[in-house]
Protein backbone atom coordinates (compact mmCIF):
# COMPACT_ATOMS: atom_id res chain seq x y z
CA UNK A 1 0.00 0.00 0.00
CA UNK A 2 1.24 3.47 -0.91
CA UNK A 3 1.43 5.48 2.32
CA UNK A 4 3.13 8.52 0.81
CA UNK A 5 1.36 11.85 0.96
CA UNK A 6 0.10 12.91 -2.46
CA UNK A 7 1.60 15.70 -4.51
CA UNK A 8 -1.08 18.08 -5.76
CA UNK A 9 -0.75 18.76 -9.49
CA UNK A 10 -3.41 20.88 -11.22
CA UNK A 11 -5.69 20.26 -8.27
CA UNK A 12 -5.33 16.46 -8.47
CA UNK A 13 -3.79 14.36 -5.65
CA UNK A 14 -0.96 12.38 -7.26
CA UNK A 15 0.36 9.37 -5.35
CA UNK A 16 2.65 8.07 -8.10
CA UNK A 17 3.54 11.10 -10.25
CA UNK A 18 6.86 9.58 -11.28
CA UNK A 19 5.08 6.58 -12.82
CA UNK A 20 2.93 8.66 -15.17
CA UNK A 21 5.77 9.43 -17.58
CA UNK A 22 7.25 5.92 -17.33
CA UNK A 23 4.03 3.97 -17.78
CA UNK A 24 3.75 1.88 -20.94
CA UNK A 25 0.82 -0.45 -20.22
CA UNK A 26 -1.59 1.95 -21.92
CA UNK A 27 -0.57 4.55 -24.52
CA UNK A 28 -1.34 8.02 -23.22
CA UNK A 29 -1.79 9.22 -26.80
CA UNK A 30 -4.94 7.08 -27.00
CA UNK A 31 -6.73 9.16 -24.37
CA UNK A 32 -7.31 12.09 -26.72
CA UNK A 33 -8.89 9.77 -29.29
CA UNK A 34 -11.05 8.22 -26.58
CA UNK A 35 -12.25 11.64 -25.44
CA UNK A 36 -13.23 12.56 -28.99
CA UNK A 37 -15.02 9.31 -29.86
CA UNK A 38 -16.58 7.87 -26.69
CA UNK A 39 -19.86 9.71 -27.18
CA UNK A 40 -20.12 8.79 -30.89
CA UNK A 41 -18.67 5.33 -31.55
CA UNK A 42 -21.11 2.39 -31.32
CA UNK A 43 -18.65 0.23 -29.37
CA UNK A 44 -18.14 2.75 -26.58
CA UNK A 45 -21.82 3.66 -26.35
CA UNK A 46 -23.17 0.11 -26.20
CA UNK A 47 -20.35 -0.90 -23.86
CA UNK A 48 -21.04 1.78 -21.25
CA UNK A 49 -24.78 1.17 -21.51
CA UNK A 50 -24.23 -2.54 -20.74
CA UNK A 51 -21.86 -1.69 -17.88
CA UNK A 52 -24.27 0.85 -16.37
CA UNK A 53 -27.13 -1.64 -16.61
CA UNK A 54 -25.04 -4.26 -14.80
CA UNK A 55 -23.89 -1.88 -12.06
CA UNK A 56 -27.28 -0.34 -11.29
CA UNK A 57 -28.80 -3.82 -10.97
CA UNK A 58 -26.59 -4.58 -7.95
CA UNK A 59 -25.23 -1.31 -6.54
CA UNK A 60 -27.04 1.67 -5.03
CA UNK A 61 -26.15 5.14 -6.22
CA UNK A 62 -25.36 6.32 -2.67
CA UNK A 63 -22.45 3.89 -2.29
CA UNK A 64 -18.77 4.83 -2.36
CA UNK A 65 -17.70 3.95 -5.89
CA UNK A 66 -14.40 4.42 -7.71
CA UNK A 67 -13.51 3.61 -11.31
CA UNK A 68 -9.85 2.60 -11.62
CA UNK A 69 -7.98 2.93 -14.89
CA UNK A 70 -10.77 5.27 -15.82
CA UNK A 71 -9.15 6.72 -18.94
CA UNK A 72 -11.16 9.87 -19.57
CA UNK A 73 -13.81 8.95 -17.00
CA UNK A 74 -16.57 8.35 -19.53
CA UNK A 75 -18.21 5.43 -17.69
CA UNK A 76 -18.20 7.39 -14.43
CA UNK A 77 -19.69 10.33 -16.29
CA UNK A 78 -22.63 8.13 -17.27
CA UNK A 79 -22.94 6.83 -13.71
CA UNK A 80 -23.38 10.42 -12.58
CA UNK A 81 -26.49 10.56 -14.78
CA UNK A 82 -27.86 7.72 -12.61
CA UNK A 83 -27.27 9.62 -9.37
CA UNK A 84 -23.85 8.18 -8.48
CA UNK A 85 -21.03 10.37 -7.20
CA UNK A 86 -18.07 8.32 -8.41
CA UNK A 87 -14.41 8.89 -7.81
CA UNK A 88 -11.93 8.05 -10.57
CA UNK A 89 -8.37 6.78 -10.43
CA UNK A 90 -5.98 6.83 -13.36
CA UNK A 91 -2.23 6.59 -13.91
CA UNK A 92 -2.23 9.33 -16.57
CA UNK A 93 -2.84 12.88 -15.38
CA UNK A 94 -4.13 13.85 -18.82
CA UNK A 95 -6.98 11.34 -18.45
CA UNK A 96 -7.95 12.86 -15.12
CA UNK A 97 -8.06 16.31 -16.69
CA UNK A 98 -10.62 14.97 -19.17
CA UNK A 99 -12.56 13.43 -16.26
CA UNK A 100 -12.63 16.79 -14.49
CA UNK A 101 -14.06 18.37 -17.63
CA UNK A 102 -17.03 16.00 -17.25
CA UNK A 103 -17.67 17.38 -13.77
CA UNK A 104 -16.06 14.51 -11.85
CA UNK A 105 -14.56 16.21 -8.82
CA UNK A 106 -12.91 13.32 -6.94
CA UNK A 107 -9.91 12.38 -9.09
CA UNK A 108 -6.74 10.55 -8.01
CA UNK A 109 -3.54 9.71 -9.83
CA UNK A 110 -2.01 6.45 -8.63
CA UNK A 111 -0.38 3.21 -9.70
CA UNK A 112 -2.58 0.12 -9.48
CA UNK A 113 0.45 -1.84 -8.29
CA UNK A 114 0.86 0.58 -5.36
CA UNK A 115 -2.61 1.71 -4.33
CA UNK A 116 -3.07 4.44 -1.66
CA UNK A 117 -6.45 3.38 -0.21
CA UNK A 118 -7.64 0.56 2.03
CA UNK A 119 -11.09 -0.72 3.07
CA UNK A 120 -12.94 2.38 1.93
CA UNK A 121 -15.05 1.56 -1.16
CA UNK A 122 -18.35 -0.29 -1.53
CA UNK A 123 -17.86 -0.92 -5.24
CA UNK A 124 -15.08 -0.54 -7.80
CA UNK A 125 -15.09 -0.53 -11.60
CA UNK A 126 -12.18 -1.83 -13.67
CA UNK A 127 -13.21 -1.50 -17.30
CA UNK A 128 -10.85 -2.77 -20.00
CA UNK A 129 -7.81 -2.41 -17.80
CA UNK A 130 -6.79 -5.92 -16.77
CA UNK A 131 -5.69 -6.91 -20.28
CA UNK A 132 -3.03 -4.18 -20.18
CA UNK A 133 -1.33 -5.52 -17.05
CA UNK A 134 1.64 -7.87 -16.71
CA UNK A 135 0.61 -8.66 -13.12
CA UNK A 136 -3.19 -8.90 -13.06
CA UNK A 137 -3.20 -10.98 -9.88
CA UNK A 138 -1.30 -8.30 -7.97
CA UNK A 139 -3.58 -5.57 -9.29
CA UNK A 140 -6.71 -7.47 -8.26
CA UNK A 141 -5.24 -8.22 -4.84
CA UNK A 142 -4.63 -4.50 -4.33
CA UNK A 143 -8.17 -3.71 -5.45
CA UNK A 144 -9.46 -6.31 -3.00
CA UNK A 145 -7.75 -4.41 -0.18
CA UNK A 146 -9.46 -1.18 -1.29
CA UNK A 147 -12.92 -2.71 -0.92
CA UNK A 148 -14.92 -3.01 2.25
CA UNK A 149 -16.07 -6.50 3.23
CA UNK A 150 -18.61 -7.83 0.70
CA UNK A 151 -17.77 -4.96 -1.64
CA UNK A 152 -18.33 -5.52 -5.36
CA UNK A 153 -15.86 -5.31 -8.22
CA UNK A 154 -17.04 -4.92 -11.83
CA UNK A 155 -14.55 -5.94 -14.54
CA UNK A 156 -14.65 -5.89 -18.34
CA UNK A 157 -11.99 -7.33 -20.63
CA UNK A 158 -11.66 -8.28 -24.31
CA UNK A 159 -12.38 -11.96 -24.93
CA UNK A 160 -10.79 -14.88 -26.82
CA UNK A 161 -7.27 -15.02 -28.19
CA UNK A 162 -8.72 -16.22 -31.50
CA UNK A 163 -9.96 -12.64 -31.91
CA UNK A 164 -6.45 -11.23 -31.33
CA UNK A 165 -5.37 -8.74 -34.00
CA UNK A 166 -2.77 -6.06 -34.53
CA UNK A 167 -4.94 -3.42 -32.90
CA UNK A 168 -4.80 -5.38 -29.64
CA UNK A 169 -1.04 -4.97 -29.60
CA UNK A 170 -1.20 -1.31 -30.63
CA UNK A 171 -3.63 -0.68 -27.76
CA UNK A 172 -1.16 -2.20 -25.31
CA UNK A 173 -3.06 -5.42 -24.68
CA UNK A 174 -1.19 -8.39 -23.23
CA UNK A 175 -4.02 -10.92 -23.47
CA UNK A 176 -7.66 -11.53 -24.36
CA UNK A 177 -9.44 -13.53 -21.66
CA UNK A 178 -11.87 -16.42 -21.63
CA UNK A 179 -14.53 -16.92 -19.01
CA UNK A 180 -12.52 -19.62 -17.15
CA UNK A 181 -9.23 -17.69 -17.24
CA UNK A 182 -10.82 -14.47 -15.96
CA UNK A 183 -12.64 -16.29 -13.17
CA UNK A 184 -9.40 -18.00 -12.15
CA UNK A 185 -7.51 -14.71 -11.82
CA UNK A 186 -10.31 -13.21 -9.71
CA UNK A 187 -10.53 -16.22 -7.42
CA UNK A 188 -6.79 -16.12 -6.83
CA UNK A 189 -7.27 -12.57 -5.53
CA UNK A 190 -9.78 -13.76 -2.91
CA UNK A 191 -12.99 -12.81 -4.72
CA UNK A 192 -16.22 -14.80 -4.91
CA UNK A 193 -17.80 -14.98 -8.35
CA UNK A 194 -21.29 -13.54 -8.77
CA UNK A 195 -21.67 -13.34 -12.54
CA UNK A 196 -19.51 -13.71 -15.63
CA UNK A 197 -20.99 -13.13 -19.06
CA UNK A 198 -19.83 -12.57 -22.61
CA UNK A 199 -21.16 -9.56 -24.50
CA UNK A 200 -20.67 -8.13 -28.00
CA UNK A 201 -21.94 -11.55 -29.04
CA UNK A 202 -23.80 -10.45 -32.17
CA UNK A 203 -20.75 -8.71 -33.67
CA UNK A 204 -18.31 -11.52 -32.85
CA UNK A 205 -18.27 -12.68 -36.52
CA UNK A 206 -17.17 -9.17 -37.52
CA UNK A 207 -14.47 -9.19 -34.84
CA UNK A 208 -13.28 -12.58 -36.11
CA UNK A 209 -13.14 -11.20 -39.65
CA UNK A 210 -11.11 -8.26 -38.38
CA UNK A 211 -8.60 -10.65 -36.81
CA UNK A 212 -8.14 -12.32 -40.20
CA UNK A 213 -7.91 -9.09 -42.18
CA UNK A 214 -5.59 -7.43 -39.65
CA UNK A 215 -3.49 -10.16 -38.03
CA UNK A 216 -0.76 -9.20 -35.60
CA UNK A 217 2.46 -9.37 -37.61
CA UNK A 218 4.29 -7.09 -35.16
CA UNK A 219 4.38 -4.32 -37.74
CA UNK A 220 3.68 -0.70 -36.94
CA UNK A 221 0.32 0.54 -38.16
CA UNK A 222 0.14 3.65 -40.30
CA UNK A 223 -1.85 6.66 -39.12
CA UNK A 224 -4.40 5.85 -41.82
CA UNK A 225 -4.81 2.30 -40.49
CA UNK A 226 -5.25 3.51 -36.92
CA UNK A 227 -7.85 6.04 -38.02
CA UNK A 228 -9.75 3.44 -40.05
CA UNK A 229 -9.98 1.25 -36.95
CA UNK A 230 -11.51 4.05 -34.90
CA UNK A 231 -13.61 5.97 -37.42
CA UNK A 232 -16.68 4.12 -38.72
CA UNK A 233 -19.02 5.14 -41.52
CA UNK A 234 -22.03 6.94 -40.01
CA UNK A 235 -24.66 4.53 -41.32
CA UNK A 236 -22.61 1.48 -40.35
CA UNK A 237 -22.05 3.00 -36.91
CA UNK A 238 -25.80 3.52 -36.41
CA UNK A 239 -26.57 -0.01 -37.60
CA UNK A 240 -24.00 -1.62 -35.32
CA UNK A 241 -25.21 0.47 -32.38
CA UNK A 242 -28.77 -0.75 -32.96
CA UNK A 243 -27.55 -4.36 -33.15
CA UNK A 244 -25.53 -4.05 -29.94
CA UNK A 245 -28.38 -2.33 -28.10
CA UNK A 246 -30.70 -5.16 -29.08
CA UNK A 247 -28.18 -7.63 -27.71
CA UNK A 248 -27.91 -5.67 -24.46
CA UNK A 249 -31.65 -6.09 -23.97
CA UNK A 250 -31.58 -9.87 -24.37
CA UNK A 251 -28.01 -10.74 -23.36
CA UNK A 252 -29.22 -12.70 -20.34
CA UNK A 253 -31.17 -14.99 -22.69
CA UNK A 254 -28.24 -15.75 -25.01
CA UNK A 255 -25.82 -18.71 -24.76
CA UNK A 256 -22.89 -17.66 -22.58
CA UNK A 257 -20.15 -19.32 -24.65
CA UNK A 258 -18.46 -16.59 -26.70
CA UNK A 259 -18.40 -12.86 -27.37
CA UNK A 260 -16.09 -9.97 -28.10
CA UNK A 261 -15.85 -8.99 -24.42
CA UNK A 262 -16.49 -10.32 -20.92
CA UNK A 263 -18.06 -8.71 -17.89
CA UNK A 264 -17.30 -10.15 -14.46
CA UNK A 265 -18.97 -9.24 -11.17
CA UNK A 266 -17.23 -10.44 -8.02
CA UNK A 267 -17.56 -9.89 -4.28
CA UNK A 268 -14.81 -9.44 -1.72
CA UNK A 269 -14.88 -12.22 0.83
CA UNK A 270 -15.67 -10.91 4.30
CA UNK A 271 -12.81 -10.85 6.77
CA UNK A 272 -13.66 -13.47 9.36
CA UNK A 273 -12.12 -11.27 12.06
CA UNK A 274 -14.85 -8.69 11.38
CA UNK A 275 -17.74 -11.13 11.52
Predicted regions and their residues:
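C-terminal helical/coil "lid" or tail adjacent to the Rossmann-like core of SAM-dependent
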Residues: 206-242
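Conserved N-terminal segment of class I S-adenosyl-L-methionine
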Residues: 1-127, 138-140, 225, 229-234, ...
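Short, glycine-/aromatic-enriched active-site segment of Class I SAM-dependent methyltransferases
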Residues: 35-36, 153-175, 179-187
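Residues lining the SAM
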Residues: 127-130, 156
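Short, P/G- and charge-enriched loop/turn segments at secondary-structure junctions
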Residues: 39, 248-254
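A short glycine-rich, Lys/Arg-flanked "PGG" loop and its adjoining helix->strand segment in the class I
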Residues: 137-152
